[in-house]
Amino acid sequence: MFGFSLFGKNLLNIWAILLGVYIYAHYHKMHLSRYVYIGFYGTSLSPIITQIMYITDLPYLLRLFISLAVGLMIGFVLPPLSTHVHYAHKGYSLYNVGFSAGIIATVVVSVLKSFGITTESRLIWSEGNNQLLFAVLCCLFVAMIIAAFLFGGKEVGTSYRKILSCSGIGGTDYLRDNGGAATVLNMAINGLFATIFVLGVGGELNGPTLGGIFTIIGFSATGKHIRNIAPIMFGVLFASFTKHWTISSPSPILALLFSTTLAPIAGEFGIFVGLLAGFLHSSVALNVGIVYGGMNLYNNGFAGGIVAIFMVPVIHSIRDRRARAKGEISL
């Protein structure tokens, strides 16, 4: 929520989706806390609400009614769909709701297009802020590191090493398993690494890239650490040497940051597979967005889900074949 408030989300376009999730929880007589995280991630579809409000051919009250109705429906269908698609990639894509949001966005945008309503994307990309924002971010990360050692004491290093040993598959909770101090340290290290990586490849620090960096920081409490995000990011970087785009361009630099949704693949299967996942993700992420015209802010969550569903069964089949071969059992 915080990161994407820098590009795409605001106080007006998120509430209908959140209310839809609340209605779903109330309908099933479940506590809202069970679905609140889906509601937060589901606000990735908030541009749809804004887009409907800008259909100038319709009266204002009708636009307001339609946007609220669509937002409520999106929020209502998100929980069951997100639960269902999780079984497809088995937690190897951390942005699970981004995958389900991509499916919903595809359906909604297709319906809008069938009524002659089209969406036009535009690029607003700020430049020249690197020195100021880098200084601010460095101060933040240094403060987090100091706070981690100040409140965590000598055990921070041990707990952090335990984090580094985790694969990071969806559902991991570093705060619960390793404590707040080690988690804050992990967040600071990942944030600093991502920031330096962006600047190192010639990228710009602005709203979208800060959103990507803060997303990495946020998910450093649940799945990401430097050992499993680095291979994915380097995979995207290596892809830029062979493909027809430059890594510092807006879409590729965002794909670089958000590709870390596939961190569990590198954490579970190793560096080489992580590099391959990043390589594939860069291609998928830069091409699937055309389906829903940018209406899903978590485009890389959708792309990451596709890559995970493609790669994980193949990797498991190879592993099973090797295991059977060692046991002298044929497939």
Segments and roles (model prediction):
Residues 32-37, 91-101, 170-185, 294-303:
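Juxtamembrane helix-loop boundaries in multi-pass membrane proteins
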Residues 149-160, 314-329:
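Membrane-interface capping segments at transmembrane-helix boundaries
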Residues 101-110, 138-146, 260, 303-315:
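Hydrophobic cores of alpha-helical transmembrane segments in multi-pass inner/ER membrane proteins
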Residues 119-213:
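Membrane-embedded hairpin module used as a gating/binding unit in multi-pass transport
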Residues 98, 128-129, 162-168, 321-331:
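Short, highly charged, low-complexity non-transmembrane loops/tails of multi-pass membrane proteins
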